[in-house]
């Protein structure tokens, strides 16, 4: 999905944003769009918005509801995903195991093979927010060796960390494009006719 520019980098990309309920996904979506804080209700289904990222990349960002009954449908949004953004509430240590399990399930889906992901530890402005190193360890992010990934702290409330999150999306998208081009080149060397 998406188009590639002359440098081999995607000019358009599909970004799926997932995470448990109350992580702040919808608030982040609209803050990334440059809006003031908006009052949100729990997302039933999805929200979709276009977004510009560094490098003149047009993103289509899908914000998928995170309540437990809706998670069974998450797999329906994964086909054609270029980048996954996984949002968690960094003040809710009790739900980190549940969040880790859901992230693992998403990344184990066949549609997610090699798809890079960005974990956004939201609500970092709160005094009880967990440090990123603790979140990284609790999610065991190092085990996802078949994916490029980044972990960023942010605040949908203050906007802190969101410019860096957009830069991370661009970096991960470039890594995905490079991996696809390398796979094609490697396939051509072997005489493989498959296309990535």
Curated annotation (Swiss-Prot):
Coiled coil: none annotated. One of its GO terms (molecular function) is GTPase activity. GO terms for biological process: hematopoietic progenitor cell differentiation; intracellular protein transport; vesicle-mediated transport. Expressed in lung and leukocytes. One of its GO terms (cellular component) is cytoplasm. GTP binds at residues 19-26, 63-67, 122-125. PROSITE patterns: ARF (PS51417). Keywords: GTP-binding, Lipoprotein, Myristate, Nucleotide-binding. InterPro entries: P-loop_NTPase, Small_GTP-bd, Small_GTPase_ARF, Small_GTPase_ARF/SAR. A lipid is attached at residue 2 (N-myristoyl glycine). It comes from the Eukaryota. It is linked to Leukemia, chronic lymphocytic: A chronic leukemia in which functionally incompetent B-lymphocytes progressively accumulate in the bone marrow, blood, and lymphoid tissues. The clinical evolution of the disorder is heterogeneous, with some patients having indolent disease and others having aggressive disease and short survival. Belongs to the small GTPase superfamily. Arf family. May play a role in apoptosis. May act as a tumor suppressor. This is ADP-ribosylation factor-like protein 11. It comes from Homo sapiens (Human). The gene is ARL11.
């Amino acid at each position: 999905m998406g188009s590639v520019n002359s440098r081999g980098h995607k000019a358009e990309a599909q970004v799926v944003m997932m995470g448990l309920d109350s992580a702040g996904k919808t608030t982040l979506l609209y803050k990334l769009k440059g809006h003031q804080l908006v009052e949100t209700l729990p997302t039933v289904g999805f929200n979709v918005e276009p977004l510009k990222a560094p490098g003149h990349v047009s993103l289509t960002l899908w914000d998928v509801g995170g309540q437990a009954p809706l998670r069974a449908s998450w797999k329906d949004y994964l086909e054609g995903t270029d980048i996954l953004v996984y949002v968690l509430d960094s003040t809710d240590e009790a739900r980190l195991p549940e969040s880790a399990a859901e992230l693992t399930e998403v990344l184990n889906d066949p549609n997610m093979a090699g798809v890079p992901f960005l974990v956004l530890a939201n609500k970092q402005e709160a005094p009880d927010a967990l440090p990123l190193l603790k979140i990284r360890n609790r999610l065991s992010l190092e085990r996802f060796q078949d994916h490029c990934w980044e972990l960023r702290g942010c605040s949908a409330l203050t906007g802190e960390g969101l410019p860096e999150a957009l830069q991370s999306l661009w970096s991960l998208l470039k890594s995905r494009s490079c991996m696809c081009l390398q796979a094609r080149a490697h396939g051509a060397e072997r005489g493989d006719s498959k296309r990535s």
